[in-house]
Amino acid sequence: MRKKSHISLAGQIMDSMELDNVFDCRPSFVTTPHKFDITFDDIERKISKFIANYDKDKGMNMRRCAGLGVIIHYIADYFTFPHNDHYPGNVKDHCYYERDLKFGMRAFLQTEEAAQIKEHVAAYDSVEELTSYIRSIHNSYMKLAHTVEEDIRYIVHACTTVVKSVMNMVSYAVG
């Protein structure tokens, strides 16, 4: 996904959960492939660390938002066709796909379907349950014929579930 798509998605999720901001503008996005098989174990550790190190007194400050933004950035890319090994296109095709995804994401986030996803996603109670869900939904995703529209639905569902679950786990950890 392109940076603007990540920002639109983050804004929609954060607005729906009344959180501040989610940032992910790190240079590692250029050097670290955003592919499930390569980075998911690291993202799983980042989720665990985020929850374990959450400081109730600081809340969702800029640093916390940036950390959650990194997690969500990778999750979104796991459900973006060009970031998966079976993508047949080249870099140019990848850029066109993400351009279409950017415009599609912007439009989708204004729909009733997007609002319904926000309302109905599950909030998991443990990192193990959450990462099991992510593995399962990614496995299902990999079996599909991919379209921009289908990617957007998976991205919004997965990312909203992750944020809702992480915030749920943090609330248990601190309160």
What are the residue ranges of the model-derived segments?
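N-terminal leader/auxiliary helical segments
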Residues: 1-70, 75-175
